[in-house]
């Protein structure tokens, strides 16, 4: 029955596509055509014709998922009477049929030829043809590139000896850059060389140099597919009436700091100097100017920066004025919140104090106090039915490396911050009382030119103290023979975690790699025996009468974004994480264990509903504690498409699971085994909607189970072939994209 319903829905959808496709020709004027499709191809084998598609001026109507012209179909459902709101609405959210324009086609043909010539195909041609069917038309552009031109020789004609010396000094350092004999002759390559020389000279004091002073002469008369290239650097001329001279090389005489707000700049002189990449007595540098802007932009105490230069008459000296506008140094905020945990209602308040210039170095002090109260229902055998939580956190963010062992030049070249934090969390529940004390010291820095950012947790301490556990909770969950669970018990004991971690992120817009590694308890594990630490009944070493955790954890994730056109793209994602407890720990702390399912994982399952392995929870229900693991695998493919207005759509396939590295009796079927794990990979599919407001995205995903490793029967294991909405459906709401 369920399969018949799906077939029926698919049939209705196909009928809708056919009807709207036919009705769209109603909007095509007589003797004109609907642009049904645009094709671009080449008569030269192996030539990437699709890469030149952006040069085509008139495109056919957009398609959802690169298949269905739903926007045009929606528009076609409207009537011509725009006084009716239904017609106006359909036309607004839809897309008007594209009427073929001969002029646009001829201009596109010309643009394609120019693009081919710029790519080195100097004798390229582009032919154009059309195919008509009824009121529809297919436009076909055929590229005839011919043979590309190559550079036979490169010569530089530089009449300014000072510039000649600068370029000569740079040549050994950048031997792989610039124009070279044997390389393709393209406009892009010439532009790159023009930009390279201009940047080099602007960074070497030639304040008034610009790329128009560089011209190229190409001689191809003696070669059929080769050119002899001359790069000319013209001398300086201020204007058409001014004499021709050598290019002036400017030096910075003084740097002066002023306040936009007519108030004193409340930053230490050393901070101003540290963030100013420009240096008195050195040649002007455009790169150092940009770096100075970036340095001051990252300071929380500064609102914006304006840098101006003044020439001293009849000299090559510059005076630099750095004008700073300062932020309000202190802010206080009060934020009430409403909470809803599994139907239990509550309230919370958050008080925040922030000082953006604590030590006159743009250090940010943040103090947060949070209190929460929740009335818990459905608990039996407990005296108290309320949940209370209080949290206090103090954090100082320094906009630089706090590391005296690092060289001054290393610290200046990187955008970095150092963070020190302390926090205390108090939780009183009917079942137990928990206290958590945390402290951390970490660095963050980035290399924007290489698309890299780093995080180093030099030390991260967490002390968990359980001052009280109710007798009812002990009897029912911790001490009961039938419910004796090592994973559960471990998470209701006093525990000390001492972490060192490192993470790196690479993101160039198309490829993203995130890698993290952390080790916990290794320093303590190394000194426990030599220093004579005592052991508890479980054989674990104790510090201050508390056992410490010991494990290593590593994660890596890779995402690839493939754009087919401005409206359609494919996102591919792979994630792998492994955590191994050893030494002083046999079980990972609950907060460090992996879980699967949810909005950012395998979306056919709710959060913490999947795994580990073929484990399916107690009595088939979600088992909050046991459905966690030491290893996680995620594989995702998501096709993203533009729908209309701010609404985007997605179709996805997810696969993955979690596993344990040890065989825990509470998690039968959960251990990772090389000959079994691939049979336990869960698969889901679904559709999603995204509301893209630019600064944030609201995401709604609807997933269905396709392969469920928790079951062995064909009907439940291969849910794709036997779909059951009640059993297999999962809905997710989240902010931001999943990867």
Listing of model-derived features with the role each one plays in the protein:
Residues 338, 377-382, 426-427, 485-491, ...:
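Extracellular loop and loop/strand-boundary signature of outer-membrane beta-barrel proteins
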Residues 338-340, 357, 369-375, 400, ...:
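Transmembrane beta-strands of outer-membrane beta-barrel pores
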């Amino acid at each position: 029955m369920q399969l018949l319903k799906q077939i029926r829905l698919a049939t209705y959808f196909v009928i809708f596509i056919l009807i709207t496709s036919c009705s769209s020709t109603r909007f095509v004027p007589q003797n004109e055509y609907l642009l049904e499709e645009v094709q671009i191809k080449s008569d030269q084998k192996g030539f990437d014709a699709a890469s030149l598609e952006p040069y085509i001026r008139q495109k056919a109507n957009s398609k959802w998922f690169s298949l269905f012209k739903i926007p045009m179909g929606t528009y076609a459902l409207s009537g011509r009477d725009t006084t009716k709101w239904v017609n106006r609405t359909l036309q607004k959210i839809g897309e008007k049929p594209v009427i073929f324009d001969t002029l646009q086609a001829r201009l596109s043909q010309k643009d394609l030829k120019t693009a081919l010539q710029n790519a080195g195909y100097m004798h390229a041609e582009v032919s154009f043809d059309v195919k008509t069917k009824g009121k529809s038309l297919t436009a076909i552009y055929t590229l005839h590139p011919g043979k590309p031109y190559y550079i036979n020789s490169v010569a530089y004609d530089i009449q300014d000896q000072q510039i000649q010396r600068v370029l000569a000094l740079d040549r050994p350092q950048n031997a792989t850059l610039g124009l070279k004999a044997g390389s393709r002759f393209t406009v892009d390559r010439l532009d790159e060389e023009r930009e390279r020389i201009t940047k080099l000279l602007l960074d070497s004091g030639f304040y008034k140099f610009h790329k128009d002073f560089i011209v190229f002469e190409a001689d191809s008369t003696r070669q059929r597919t080769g050119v002899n290239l001359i790069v000319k650097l013209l001398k300086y001329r201020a204007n058409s009436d001014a004499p021709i001279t050598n290019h002036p090389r400017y030096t910075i005489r003084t740097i002066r700091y002023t306040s936009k707000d007519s108030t004193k700049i409340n930053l230490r002189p050393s901070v101003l100097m540290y963030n100013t990449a420009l240096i008195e007595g050195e040649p002007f540098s455009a790169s150092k100017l940009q770096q100075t802007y970036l340095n001051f932009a990252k300071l929380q105490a500064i609102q914006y920066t304006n840098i101006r230069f003044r020439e001293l008459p009849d000299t090559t000296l510059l005076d630099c004025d750095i004008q700073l506008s300062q932020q309000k140094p202190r802010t206080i905020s009060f934020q009430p919140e409403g909470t809803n945990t599994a139907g239990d209602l509550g309230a919370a308040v958050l008080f925040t104090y922030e000082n953006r210039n604590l030590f006159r170095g743009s250090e940010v002090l943040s103090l947060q106090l949070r209190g929460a109260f929740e009335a818990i229902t459905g608990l039996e055998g407990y005296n108290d039915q309320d949940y209370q939580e209080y949290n206090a956190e103090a954090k100082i963010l320094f906009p630089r490396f706090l590391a005296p062992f690092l060289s001054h030049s290393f610290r200046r070249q990187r955008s970095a911050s150092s963070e020190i934090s302390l926090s205390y969390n108090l939780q009183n529940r009917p079942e137990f009382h928990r206290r958590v004390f945390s402290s951390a010291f970490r660095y963050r820095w980035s290399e924007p030119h290489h698309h890299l950012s780093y995080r180093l947790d030099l030390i991260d301490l967490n002390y968990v103290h359980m001052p009280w556990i109710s007798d009812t909770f002990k009897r029912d969950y911790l001490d009961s023979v039938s419910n004796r669970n090592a994973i559960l018990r471990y998470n209701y004991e006093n525990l000390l975690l001492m972490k060192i971690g490192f993470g790196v992120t690479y993101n160039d817009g198309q490829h993203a790699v995130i890698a993290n590694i952390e080790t916990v308890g290794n320093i303590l594990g190394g000194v426990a025996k030599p220093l004579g630490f005592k052991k508890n009944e479980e054989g674990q070493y104790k510090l201050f009468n508390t056992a410490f955790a010991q494990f290593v954890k590593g994660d890596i994730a890779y995402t690839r974004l493939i754009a087919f056109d401005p409206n359609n793209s494919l996102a591919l994602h792979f994630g792998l994480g492994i955590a191994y407890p050893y030494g002083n720990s046999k079980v990972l702390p609950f907060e460090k264990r992996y879980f699967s399912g949810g909005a950012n994982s395998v979306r056919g399952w709710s959060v913490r509903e999947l795994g580990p392995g073929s484990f399916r929870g107690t009595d088939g229900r979600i088992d909050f504690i046991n459905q966690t693991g030491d290893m996680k695998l995620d594989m995702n493919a998501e096709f993203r498409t533009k729908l209309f207005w701010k609404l985007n759509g997605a179709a996805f396939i997810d696969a993955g699971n979690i596993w344990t590295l040890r065989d825990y009796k509470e998690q039968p079927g959960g251990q990772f085994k090389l000959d079994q794990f691939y049979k336990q990979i869960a698969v889901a599919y679904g559709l999603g909607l995204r509301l893209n407001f630019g600064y944030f995205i609201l995401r709604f995903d609807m997933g269905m189970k396709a392969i469920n490793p928790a079951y062995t029967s064909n009907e439940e294991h291969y849910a794709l072939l036997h779909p059951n909405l009640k059993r297999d459906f999962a809905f997710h709401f989240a902010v931001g994209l999943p990867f």
